């Protein structure tokens, strides 16, 4: 009877539908919104649907998620989306105004969920989960901090160009190519960051020559970004998330994990009393 009452109580709770951009976003927003569930409400995270040729089909993307709460008259609906550059635009574009001024739209503040998955303080734990080796051979927080400071000047240019509707001078994809890193190893990280810094300076030099009017706005853009909570040390949270994840963080994490696996295997080879024990330990570790 107690269990039945509990089930009925759960059904009586207010259901709030949270529309997200893709299936990949469901778990992230479940983790966030779950903290705000109580005896009076719960959230159900789902992709929006829309009518097409007489039947409902799944909608994808930020626009679809936001339009779902705009077009539906029922209550208890929210949209949960990536901020992309829209938060940083601060109303300079229609998409930014929609994000900032539409009621019941929750966003990441960071560019995307991928940026938050790259949170520097958690990357060592990722390596431990993969390798079962807790040896701190690499300072992820320092790396992400130095990388962020290195790309910050070009990032400010990117925001300035997008705010001025002049992004054709350097699209986000163009910036991605400049701030990409070479194949990393634990022994060439400093050189990699120096090369990124060199590429950043070269691109800024070209932009200053071709767009002196935008160059004059950069100090104001920098100040406005700091007011929004963006700092040179945390630039990575506001870069193109997929590029950051796939072309910067994953290669470095893979490099560190490979080192930790080799280290653990060499340790097993050294400490095993005999070959049978060594094979058993290696088998368990694998």
Residue spans for each PLM region:
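Acidic, divalent-metal-binding catalytic cores of TOPRIM
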Residues: 1-286
């Amino acid at each position: 009877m107690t269990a039945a009452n509990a089930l009925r109580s759960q059904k009586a709770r207010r259901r709030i539908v949270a529309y997200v951009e893709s299936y990949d976003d469901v778990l992230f927003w479940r983790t966030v919104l779950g903290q705000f569930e109580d005896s009076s409400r719960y959230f159900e995270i789902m992709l929006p649907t829309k009518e097409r040729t007489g039947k409902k089909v799944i909608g994808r993307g930020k626009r679809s998620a936001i339009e779902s709460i705009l077009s539906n008259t029922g209550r208890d609906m929210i949209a949960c989306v990536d901020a992309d550059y829209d938060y940083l635009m601060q109303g300079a574009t229609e998409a930014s105004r929609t994000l900032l001024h539409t009621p019941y739209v929750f966003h990441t503040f960071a560019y995307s969920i991928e940026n938050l998955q790259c949170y520097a303080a958690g990357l060592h734990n990722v390596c431990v989960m993969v390798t079962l080796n807790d040896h701190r051979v690499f300072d992820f927080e320092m790396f992400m901090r130095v990388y962020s400071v290195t790309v910050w000047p070009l990032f400010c240019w990117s925001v300035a160009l997008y705010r001025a509707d002049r992004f054709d001078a350097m699209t986000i994809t163009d910036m991605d190519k400049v701030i990409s890193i070479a194949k990393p190893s634990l022994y060439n990280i400093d050189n990699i960051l120096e090369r990124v810094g060199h590429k950043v300076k070269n691109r800024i030099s070209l932009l200053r020559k071709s767009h002196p009017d935008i160059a004059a706005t950069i100090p104001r853009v920098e100040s406005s970004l700091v007011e929004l909570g963006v700092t040179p040390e945390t630039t990575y949270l506001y870069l193109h998330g997929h590029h950051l994840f796939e072309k910067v963080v994953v290669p470095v994490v893979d490099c560190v994990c490979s080192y930790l696996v080799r280290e653990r295997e060499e340790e097993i080879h050294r400490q095993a009393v005999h070959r049978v024990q060594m094979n058993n330990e290696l088998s368990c570790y694998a």
